[in-house]
A protein has these predicted regions:
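N-terminal helix-turn-helix DNA-binding module of bacterial transcription factors
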Residues: 1-54
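An N-terminal-biased, well-structured beta-alpha scaffold segment characteristic
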Residues: 59-151, 273
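Short glycine-/small-residue-rich Rossmann-like dinucleotide-binding loops
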Residues: 22, 50, 111, 133, ...
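Rossmann-like dinucleotide-binding domain for NAD(H)/NADP(H)
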Residues: 146, 150-151, 283-347
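An anion/phosphate-binding loop that grips the pyrophosphate of nucleotide cofactors and donors
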Residues: 103, 122, 254-255, 283
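Rossmann-like dinucleotide/phosphate-binding beta-alpha-beta segment
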Residues: 191-282
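Short acidic active-site motifs
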Residues: 92-96, 113-117, 247-250, 272-275, ...
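Phosphate-binding beta-alpha-beta segment of Rossmann-like dinucleotide-binding domains, i.e.
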Residues: 146, 154-202, 217
Length: 347
C-alpha cells in the first residue's frame, strides 16, 4: 500500500501523515499516535527518510536550488552551514527538470510547483523545503515514497496570516473597502455603509491548526464567540482556546463569520459549495485566507448574487492570479491578491 492509498483509506491528507510519521513538532502527539496505530492496523509501511537535519547541515557539498524569492536573511543560514545555493527564479517545469539533478534540495514558496515529474527526475534530491505553511504545491506522496523530506515553516507566517484573516473580518463588518471606493468618488454615504460590531458575534473556524488557533485567540480578545470544526483538534486544545468544538453543519448554521483554515486536499477541495452555503445565515460572511479550491467559486458567485449570505472576502483563489472571474462582477465581495503571508516580519 502506498501513501496515497493509505491516505484515502483513513481519510487523513498525505502531508499530515508524512509529517506525523517523520515526527514533525507541529503535529500533535495525539495525531501522531492515531496515525501510527492506523498504519499498523492497515499494514502500511512508510518509506521514511533516513536523512536528518543534522546530517544535512554537516555535508559541505550539499547544494540547494532557491526557486522562489525568500528573505535575504535566510541566505545566512545556508552560508553558516556550508550549504551551496543557486538562486534561479520564475523557472518553468521543463527548466527545473533540466537542472534538478544537480541539487540535493529545493526551496520554494507558493509559485513554483514541485511535481511528480520533477521529483522522479533526480536521484540526488533529499529535501524539498516550502518557505511557508501549505505544501499543496508539492507532490508530497511521491516525495515521501522516494524517501525525500518535505519541510515547511508552519509557525513563520501563522500570526501574519491570522491578522490578515481578521482584517478581512473587520473589513466586511465595517464595509471599509466599499466605503473607501464610494468616498474617493466624492460621495458621502454614511447610512449605506452602516456596519456591525464584532463583540459578541460568533466566528466559526473550519480548521484550527497554527493559523486557525491564532485567529481564535485574536477573536477571543475581541470578545467574540469561537466555534471550531476540526476532527483532529484535541479537547485540551479546544479548552485552551476557550472555543466550542462543533460539526461543520453546526459551525455553518450558527456563525456570523465563517473563516477557513484548512490545507487543500482531495478531502477538502470544494468543502464549501452551494449546498453548504445554504446552511449559513443570510446575515453571515465567508472568509478564505487559507487555500484556493476550498470554496467552489462558481457556487459562491451564485450565493452572493442571490444574497444567500451577506458577503465574502477571499485572499486565495483556485487559479492565481485571478483573471476573468465571475467574482469580479460582485459588489458584496472583498478580493485581495494572496497577501496572507506578505509582511516584512513573516518574510
Amino acid at each position: 500500500m502506498n501513501l496515497k492509498e493509505f491516505s484515502k483509506r483513513i481519510g487523513i491528507n498525505p502531508s499530515t501523515i508524512s509529517r506525523a510519521l517523520n515526527d514533525y513538532p507541529d503535529i500533535s502527539q495525539k495525531t501522531k499516535d492515531t496515525i501510527l496505530k492506523l498504519a499498523k492496523k492497515h499494514s502500511y509501511k512508510p518509506n521514511l527518510s533516513a536523512q536528518s537535519i543534522g546530517s544535512i547541515k554537516s555535508k559541505t557539498s550539499f547544494k540547494v536550488l532557491i526557486a522562489d524569492k525568500i528573505s535575504d536573511a535566510s541566505f545566512k543560514i545556508f552560508k553558516d552551514n556550508n550549504i551551496l545555493i543557486d538562486k534561479k527564479y520564475n523557472l518553468t517545469e521543463d527548466q527545473i527538470l533540466s537542472i534538478i539533478s544537480n541539487y540535493d534540495g529545493i526551496v520554494v514558496r507558493s509559485s513554483t510547483k514541485v511535481t511528480k515529474k520533477i521529483i522522479e527526475k533526480s536521484n540526488r534530491l533529499k529535501v524539498i523545503a516550502r518557505a511557508g505553511v501549505g505544501v499543496d504545491n508539492v507532490d508530497v506522496v511521491t516525495a515521501t515514497n522516494r524517501g525525500i523530506i518535505v519541510m515547511n515553516s508552519p509557525q513563520s507566517t501563522s500570526r501574519t496570516t491570522a491578522e490578515h484573516a481578521i482584517s478581512l473580518v473587520f473589513s466586511l463588518a465595517r464595509k471599509i473597502p466599499f466605503a473607501h471606493h464610494s468616498t474617493i468618488q466624492k460621495k458621502w454615504e454614511k447610512e449605506l455603509f452602516k456596519g456591525i460590531e464584532l463583540k459578541s458575534k460568533t466566528i466559526g473556524l473550519v480548521g484550527c491548526g497554527n493559523i486557525g488557533s491564532e485567529v481564535a485567540r485574536i477573536a477571543k480578545s475581541l470578545e467574540m464567540n469561537v466555534m471550531v470544526y476540526d476532527p483532529f483538534l484535541s479537547a485540551e486544545k479546544i479548552e485552551s482556546l476557550d472555543a466550542e468544538k462543533s460539526s461543520l453543519d453546526e459551525v455553518l448554521k450558527h456563525s456570523d463569520f465563517v473563516s477557513l483554515h484548512l490545507p487543500l486536499t482531495i478531502n477538502t477541495k470544494n468543502i464549501i459549495n452551494l449546498k453548504q452555503i445554504k446552511k449559513m445565515k443570510k446575515t453571515s460572511y465567508l472568509v478564505n485566507a487559507a487555500r484556493g479550491g476550498l470554496i467552489n467559486e462558481n457556487d459562491l458567485h451564485i450565493a452572493l448574487k442571490n444574497k444567500l449570505i451577506t458577503g465574502a472576502a477571499l485572499d486565495v483563489f483556485e487559479s492565481e492570479p485571478l483573471k476573468n472571474s465571475l467574482l469580479h462582477s460582485l459588489d458584496n465581495i472583498i478580493l485581495t491578491p494572496h497577501l496572507g503571508a506578505s509582511t516584512t516580519e513573516a518574510q
